[in-house]
């Protein structure tokens, strides 16, 4: 992916460098681009000399990004070599027929470093950029169990390469083995692999052993973890350690075990990165992480934030306790702790757990706002790393968007927002029926077959991350109820506004069976419905249904993608499967339990079934 070189520099004519061939160019003053990225070198004049060296100063032990641009023909070539204490590393080899831009990431110690560029056969180097960038972590490779909410699952390494994740991260958090990952190649090109561990496993094994939690026991447990023990892995990330007092008796033993662990040459270069939750509240916990930081490990602070009702409230959350003020609390305990911290944002966006809790808000914009705050707020200056948690709860559109956000903020060093869509979705009104039937045109099949109702706690059952991280309590408890009739459907509709002709949009709907909710006896089966959108063309290969369970209830998550032909349209949803509906999942090869009544022009399910409709979200869909 081509980095944004300055146009004037790319267009410059080839000219000879003033310095003699092979003379190293001195390191230049670094330029801070945002809180995450510092530019260490940007070639101003194309190199036509056969050999040239460039010095740069890495401001801290951490990741650097090197991008080189060259156009070569025939036998010409351009090579970029990094000189390290362990030997020379070829970062790029430009040859005829290869891409014009090569990129590489390497983890380097702080201090002076040198690149050598060799131009052969009259070739020229037209661009060379070196930047200090954050650690960018992808969690978690090999987490197969719940990646069912997409036609693209499983999210194996081959898929992640296709959607742009692989080229925009430098650390993989491994949950389970993935045969499509060439771990040797990944590490040879500079990437790292950490394995995921859980404190619940540590607690379970300790209880089974019947032994007290001592430094000896903790050391034996930790030293046996694959990420520390295996030579082809770079460490562990352990979930989780909190400041609520639940682990206060264990922190002294963990601190001593950590000291012993990293004084052992066997674990040189390894890391033990703990997931943390407001750990600044616990002095013993802070002593534990200070020991880890001293050994070169980082802490991974969890912050999973839900959408806010307005953009102003979202901004206040991020600049307040959601991100910036939380960091300030840590800094009171340890100044500059952000330089040893990976900020772990949540991008759960689909069942069984979702931070996309408000169908009136564009979740991709909220994701953009979070990284924008991290890139710009002074409290986060020099932050060591970032990650989104975690892929098993994210749909493939969100994964693709996260790659673009990483690129924008963590590699290009941008301060502006990546997207231009509004925070509040302008397309439909009252998508959660919180205002009754306002904005909707209800057409009941018969008297009393359709109404807006309420069920306490139903929003939580829809996988909304409610009651934590700024979420609105009781959001999603209202729904539209229909009772299926034998002779005609119940339908509800409203105009769709502010569409861009030719653009892709997604429509999400969550359904459940009302009587199953009341009886707490539920059957795992997809609910069938009819969706009609005029002036639109369906995109079936991007659409899917996902049946998920939540607290004794089976629900259906409907995800429908379409391309609009006009700036307005009409959305009609029915509890029948109509002849001309555009949502026909059985033709798309999705495997789920379709009810036997599903036929064109028929009810699509048993007469008398009481369906619950909620979370009617219509928003722009990321096309590439």
List the model feature ranges, each with a label.
Residues 46-47, 85-109, 534-569, 574, ...:
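Extracellular carbohydrate recognition and processing domains
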Residues 116-123, 573-582, 596-607:
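Short beta-strand-plus-loop segments that form exposed binding edges in beta-rich domains
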Residues 432-478:
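Extracellular glycan-recognition surfaces and repeat-rich motifs
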Residues 76-88, 524-536:
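Short, surface-exposed beta-strand/strand-loop-strand elements in extracellular ectodomains
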Residues 58, 66-70, 74-76, 86, ...:
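Glycan-processing catalytic domains of CAZymes
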Residues 43-57, 98-104, 122-125, 481-502, ...:
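Short beta-strands within extracellular/lumenal beta-sheet-rich domains
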Residues 60-70, 433, 490-523, 558-562, ...:
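Extra-cytoplasmic beta-strand recognition segments
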Residues 70-79, 121-124, 485-486, 499-501, ...:
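Extended, low-complexity, turn-rich repeat/linker tracts enriched in Gly/Pro/Ser/Thr and Asp/Glu
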């Amino acid at each position: 992916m081509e980095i944004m070189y300055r146009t004037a520099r790319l267009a410059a004519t080839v000219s000879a460098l003033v310095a003699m061939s092979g003379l190293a160019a001195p390191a230049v003053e670094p330029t801070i681009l945002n809180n995450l990225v510092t530019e260490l070198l940007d070639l101003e004049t194309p190199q036509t000399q056969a050999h040239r060296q460039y010095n740069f100063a890495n401001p801290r032990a951490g990741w650097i990004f090197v991008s080189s641009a060259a156009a070569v023909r025939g036998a010409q070539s351009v090579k970029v070599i990094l000189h390290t204490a362990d030997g020379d590393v070829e970062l790029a080899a430009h040859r005829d027929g290869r891409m014009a831009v090569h990129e590489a990431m390497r983890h380097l110690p702080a201090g002076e470093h040198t690149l050598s560029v060799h131009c052969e056969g009259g070739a020229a180097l037209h661009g060379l950029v070196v930047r200090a960038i954050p650690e960018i972590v992808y969690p978690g490779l090999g987490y197969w169990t719940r990646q069912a909410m997409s036609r693209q699952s499983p999210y194996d390494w081959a898929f992640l390469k296709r959607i742009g994740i692989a080229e925009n991260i430098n650390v993989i958090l491994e949950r389970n083995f993935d045969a499509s990952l060439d771990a040797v190649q990944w590490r040879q090109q500079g990437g790292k692999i950490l394995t995921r561990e859980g404190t619940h496993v540590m607690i379970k094994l300790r209880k089974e052993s019947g032994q007290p939690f001592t430094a000896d026991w903790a050391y034996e447990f930790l030293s046996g973890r694959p990420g520390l023990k295996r030579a082809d892995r770079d460490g562990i990330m352990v979930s989780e350690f909190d400041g609520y007092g639940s682990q206060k008796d264990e922190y002294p033993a963990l601190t001593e075990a950590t000291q012993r662990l990293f004084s052992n040459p066997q674990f040189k270069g390894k890391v033990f990165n703990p997931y943390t939750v407001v750990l600044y509240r616990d002095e013993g916990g802070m002593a534990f992480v200070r020991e880890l930081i001293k050994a070169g490990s980082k802490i991974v602070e969890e912050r999973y934030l839900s959408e806010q009702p307005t953009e102003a409230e979202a901004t206040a959350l991020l600049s307040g306790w959601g991100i910036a003020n939380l960091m300030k609390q840590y800094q009171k305990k340890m100044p500059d702790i952000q330089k040893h911290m990976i900020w772990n944002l949540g991008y759960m966006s689909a069942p069984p757990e979702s931070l996309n809790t408000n169908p009136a808000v564009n979740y991709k914009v909220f994701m953009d706002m979070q990284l924008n705050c991290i890139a710009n707020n002074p409290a986060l200056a020099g932050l060591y790393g970032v990650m989104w948690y975690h892929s098993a709860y994210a749909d493939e559109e969100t994964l693709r968007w996260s790659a673009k956000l990483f690129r924008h903020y963590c590699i290009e060093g941008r301060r502006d927002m990546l997207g231009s869509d509004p925070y509040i979705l302008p397309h439909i009104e009252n998508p959660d029926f919180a205002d009754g039937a306002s904005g909707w045109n209800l057409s009941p099949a018969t008297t009393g077959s359709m109404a807006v109702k309420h069920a306490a706690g139903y929003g939580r059952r829809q996988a909304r991350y409610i009651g934590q991280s700024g979420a609105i309590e009781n959001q999603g408890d209202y729904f539209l109820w229909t009772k299926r009739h034998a002779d005609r459907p119940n339908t509800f509709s409203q105009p769709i506004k502010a569409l861009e002709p030719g653009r892709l949009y997604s429509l999400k709907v969550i359904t459940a069976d009302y009587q199953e909710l009341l009886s707490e006896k539920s059957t795992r089966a997809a609910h069938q419905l009819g969706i009609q959108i005029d002036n639109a063309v369906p995109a079936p290969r991007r659409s899917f249904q996902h049946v998920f369970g939540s607290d004794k209830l089976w629900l259906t998550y409907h995800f429908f993608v379409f391309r609009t032909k006009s700036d307005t349209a009409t959305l009609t949803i029915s509890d029948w499967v109509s002849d001309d509906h555009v949502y026909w999942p059985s033709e798309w090869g999705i495997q789920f339990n379709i009810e036997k009544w599903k036929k064109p022009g028929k009810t699509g399910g048993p007469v008398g079934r009481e369906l619950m409709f909620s979370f009617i979200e219509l928003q722009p869909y990321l096309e590439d």
